[in-house]
Amino acid sequence: MDAIELRMGEMRRYIITMIDEHSDYVLALAVPSLNSDIVNHFFSRAARLFPVGISQIITDNGKEFLGSFDKTLQEAAIKHLWTYPYTPKMNAICERFNRALREQFIEFNEILLFEDLALFNLKLAEYLALYNSKRPEYRRASRAKPDH
């Protein structure tokens, strides 16, 4: 799980991303601000949509992954693993998805992200549906894709 920060002038937007390392199933949501409560809300909704149960989460040491989010993980008996500072390779699968998301979607919709967040999220959901079910390349051919 990770967050992407984007800026346009003084404005900031964030995209929270989450990927299952076994199936490559991904979810993401653009938000106007980022804190533990927002990440917790995203995670609570995302956990219901994931095709498999969640046993552990890997995040960086951002403050948005502490507080109510970390408490929710503890209550659900989900192991929370933190990466070491400045070591993106420890969360490489999520970081690689973030790069693909930037190159394949955000670059073409960045203005919309700052002008109409709801419409951006609608288009993001369409992109993720395609990414999760019909993308031509798979990171690992042996991985099973969810049947949706």
Predicted regions and their residues:
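Short, well-ordered alpha-helical microsegments
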Residues: 40, 65-69
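An active-site-proximal beta-strand-loop segment
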Residues: 1-27, 33
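Short small-residue beta-strand/loop micro-motif enriched in glycine and branched aliphatics
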Residues: 24-29, 81-83, 107-108
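C-terminal domain-tail junction helix/linker
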Residues: 67, 76, 99, 103-148
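Active-site beta-loop-alpha junctions of metal-dependent nucleic acid enzymes
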Residues: 11, 29-52
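Acidic/histidine-rich, metal-coordinating catalytic segments
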Residues: 34, 52-66, 141-145
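Mobile genetic element proteins and their domesticated derivatives, centered on retroelements
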Residues: 2, 18, 24, 43, ...
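RNase H-like polynucleotidyl transferase catalytic core
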Residues: 56-61, 75-93, 109-115
